[in-house]
Amino acid sequence: MFLGLLGALAAHAQINELPRSTPEAEGVPSKAVTALFDSLMALPKTDIHSVVVLRHGKVIGEIYPAPFAPEYRHTMYSCSKTFVGAAVGLAIADNRLLLTDRVGTFFPELLPDSVSANLADMTVRDLLTMTSGITPDWNMRNLTSDWIRTFLAKPVKTPGKKFEYDSISTYMLSAIVQKVTGMTLLDYLKQKLFTPMHITDVAWEISPEGINTGGWGLHIQSESLAKFGLLLLNRGVWEGRQLLPASWVEQMMTRQIGDYGYQMWLCEYPGAIRMDGALGQYVLIIPDKDMVVVITECTLIDGATQRRLVWNRLLPAVTGDQPLIAGKDYKRLQKKQSSYQLPVVQGKASSSLVGKYADKSIMLEPNKFGWQSLELHFKQKEVIMTVTETNGTKYDLLFGYKQWKKASIEGYPPYSIEAKGRFNGIEGP
């Protein structure tokens, strides 16, 4: 295979709506913001996609290392869960739902023939706190299209006792919200939060059952993540309007079991709370500093490393609210913010092995991407990789030599792909 750097992105134009300020105007030294950015960019096995730092509701620093840009949407993985937690609170406020409601009562037609006492006792709160009593089955969604029925058919231990992190529990919450509101989770959030907050750059993956996946699958811009983080920081208030009940935000951000609230995590830094997604997606909410930090990335190291950089490089410099004098450090920050870029993939630009595979169909083993075969077309400045999916869909991915190339993939949510690659080798029969 031709190996290159491949970033999954989705572009949508909606940026720079939050007010901007200098770090010094909000009581933060530019030097500390630069130190955070430099430290994050230097992490091994990590590609930073974006970092946005806010204080007092204003953006005081942001980076989008090339080829990333503010208008790109990012795949949020489990950061999606916190939005589901908010939707549950909204449904409760609308008198459509109770924490004590039994999960099985929403899906009587999907219950097993024999309903155990533990299944009958499982509540909405148990799903919120990851204490459903069902052992997580991370492969279930790849083996069946009947997710709700399969989940309810599994053995259930005593609910409410043991924390077992499970994205399907959050999917069940999405299904419940859809059941009681008559609209998908995404449409409900659009009505209640996204439209008032002018978050229009959002999409959410859909299950075979026609339900937003809930526990994963949200695609959203970094600035919109920052807006949502501010909403939580301000206890549900947005531009003077109470969009999300303050009491519910408090419950979401309060320890319910272990280090978990309602679809959110408590942090190592005292009082800080976070949204947390695979491969290093974070929204850090830091009440004592009146700050929000958004990080999107692809990292293969322990995510606690990134959080420690925020705690140790940035926060110690935030000692008060008095404005500081902006000088050379701010000018340096301005220059660096626009200069960050992801590293170039190393390797050769060509190989004698290319001819063996060029313009030929390469059949693939079954894989999670649903790719059936590839064709590699080597051009002067790029490689065109034609992908054929098992359903017959075809599209091209472009890999540039010493430059980024963009291609789009049709579907929902839509993707843009930017890639830069060099020849590292071909492996095959």
Give residue ranges: language-model regions.
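A short, well-structured edge-of-sheet supersecondary motif
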Residues: 38-68, 290-293
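Active-site helix/loop module of the DD-peptidase/beta-lactamase fold
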Residues: 75, 94-132, 181-216
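Catalytic-site signature segments of enzymes, centered on catalytic residues
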Residues: 134-218
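Active-site-proximal alpha-helical segments within enzyme catalytic domains
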Residues: 172-176, 216-237, 281-298, 311
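Active-site Gly/Thr loop motif
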Residues: 247-296
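Peripheral terminal and inter-domain segments
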Residues: 328-429
